[in-house]
């Protein structure tokens, strides 16, 4: 079965550009053939209402992505975030998760950063 996914952020942006509601844009995306949503974790904080809305439009969560700052966050904070990420994916039935490991900032010691990342 082939699935056609769209980033949830694109739905929000299209709704804003067209001056329409988020809900109507979700419905329009479904009419255009999209079946799945690629979602940023922070957009799914109101799990029950969001899942009900997606389901009412005939859409499902295909994947959930989130940014992690493995270089600056404690391992405990990263693990807590990842646990929430996986729990949310399970709740929505998402088959894929993507952990984005953050970015180096200007002035960061890249070699030390890679070494710290390798330790974790």
What residue ranges belong to the model's regions?
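N-terminal pre-domain/capping segments
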Residues: 1-94, 112
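Short linear capping/connector segments at secondary-structure termini
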Residues: 102-105
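Active-site cleft segment of glycoside hydrolase catalytic domains centered on the general acid/base Glu
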Residues: 107-120
